[in-house]
Amino acid sequence: MCGISGIASRRLRPDELRPVAERMARSLRHRGPDGTYVQCFSPPTTTECLALGHNRLAIIDVSEAGREPMSNEDGTLWLTFNGEIYNFREVRPRLEARGHRFCSRTDAEVIVHLYEEKGPDCVSELDGIFAFAILDLARNEIFLARDRIGVKPLFYAATHDSFLFGSEIKAILASSLIEPRMNRQAVSDFFTFLYVPCPETAFEGISQLPPAHTLQLRLHDHSFSIKRYWEVARDEGVEHCSYEQLKSEIRKRLAAAVERQLVSDVPLGVFLSGGVDSTVVAGLAKEAKADIQTYTLTLPGDEYRFYNEAVKGRAVSRHLGTQHCELPLEVPELDSILDLVEFSDQPFANPTSYLMYELSKKAREHITVALCGAGGDELFAGYPRSAAVRLARKLEAVPRPLVQFGGKALALLHDSHRNPRLRRARKFLRGLNSDFFVQYCHWTYFLSEGEKHKLLNGDLARQTDGNGLKPSAEILRSAFNQCSLSEPDNCVLEMDLKTFLADNVLEYTDRMSMATALEVRVPLLDCGFVELGLNVPFAYKIRHGRTKAVLFDAFSEFFPSEARNAPKRGFNAPLGQWVGRLFDDYFDIHGRRSGPVREKLGEDVGASWREGILDIGFIQQLRTEHHRGKSDRSHELFACMIFDVWWRKYIRKTQPLVHW
């Protein structure tokens, strides 16, 4: 994995180009500690000033021959690439047979020569996780592409005289050609989802290229077109397979994906929580590579037992025979959690990002590449909401007053942040009277449209009320309507894959691992396996009360007895226990000029509500509900804190950026 960046500008003179391109590349140096390189082009070679940047994390062919940006034989094509191409060993001989000359053993060089053969259609033959840019001097174009599922990120911005791109938003901001301004729609969506959905970003004028899309920039007029090149297709053959046939096919295809993703010239291991997905990946890795290492992040202390994965991880490792390493996590300081906003460059309030950062940082002392189990929940109905969809359908026959009575009874119970099950049950019952996508927002996400209208104050609130901003549930509706699978329940899973997985799980997986220069691979998101998994009949996914049933049964021998019936916990952080004690100080309405939060985070803590962006009255209401145990509001309050940090660092620019 690496970091990529680039610029095409009519505004810059040749002597101004290199300093800008170097600033952009240097901002991504955490993604590639093995070298930062910039290649510049200017008239008369080109019609305007162009530059490509690359930060290298060497994985395949670590020699200087793999250095990027790299070109084809005659220098008419130049590539900067982030990711891994898993089928490069199959593609390369075909290209060599057609006369292409290779100068390295890298997977990246295959892209250059495949583009020579196929042009933009080259992406259809690439199996991997990637984001790349090709400067095509002969066609006077820049071609951008992002992998099918969205494992690797790619952002871009276009002005009247410049086009910029990068693996992270910070590369674009580092150019100083884009003034950071808040995107109101994105901020509204953030307070629903706790992340910003693609293709929006929190900055006006900066977008994210969606997964499975390409972008062609025509340099003669800076016009560009975006095109989808892949979509999950319905597979009637899979739909009609028996349970036993599908177990066999799942095993065969996933084993092949894991074996392909074990290729590395540097140390490699597996993240192991002891859950179904990571256990399956670890078991297959062990079958293919006898000396596989596994790593588990542990949270010592009885108060964290709901979140601690140590016991299950240890049991699975012992059962599989892996070389196991437990990585204990200390209770973090608030500033260390909040400063992680700099790795996303926009509001992102899933506290699991901190766990991924610490796991990656600690594992990086031992390995450079890790395999993880991301994707299993979306493919095989592992989340509680997958069962909720079916339960809601059954409850349609239950009289509404009875359902409402159940909701009122749950409201009387004291809510504890130590166990999220009560919160889920309340949200489930609250959403039953709504349109399906509004229901799903209730079950899965956080602030409702009505609550956001109370929180988002001043100009932002007026925009949200009546000036063209869309309800966040429309993002889910749009993703669902693009699905072509035969079963509605599987379409919901695909919707999750396109939204929750791509914009949340893969966002923090990439940003937090690459912040430590660790490459994370995701075998369950091999595109062929994704197509298989989403087409498996839903009845095989939730079966006899077990979620992910067919996946578990396909690999049942990998699970020790103590892990077979353990409840799903997920990779979650004990947010309420970590930051609850600091809410009072952060949201102090009187603006005390002392206290641990202000000492570490700056005297302008709370600028976003003092300046009328957020409504402190509604925040106080959330605090009251939280303190009285009426409702666990730790995630919503944490989101307000994250937004305030982002606002001060990126929009007001009153707080320094500590990580870049």
Feature-to-residue mapping (PLM):
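Adenosyl-5′-phosphate
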Residues: 1-4, 8, 97, 121, ...
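Alpha-helix capping and helix-loop boundary segments enriched in small/acidic/polar residues
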Residues: 304, 347-350, 397, 413
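Phosphate/oxyanion-binding loops and surfaces in catalytic or ligand/nucleic-acid-binding neighborhoods
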Residues: 27, 31, 88, 151, ...
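Generic hydrophobic alpha-helical membrane-span motif
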Residues: 38-40, 153-156, 280-283, 379, ...
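Short secondary-structure boundary/capping segments
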Residues: 311, 341-342, 384-391, 656-658
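Cysteine-centered catalytic environments shared across enzyme families
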Residues: 1-344, 356, 360, 556-557, ...
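Short low-complexity, flexible loop/linker segments enriched in glycine and/or proline
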Residues: 339-343, 364, 386-388, 578-580
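Active-site adenylate/phosphate-handling loop in enzymes that bind or generate adenylated species
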Residues: 148, 358-417, 500, 505-529
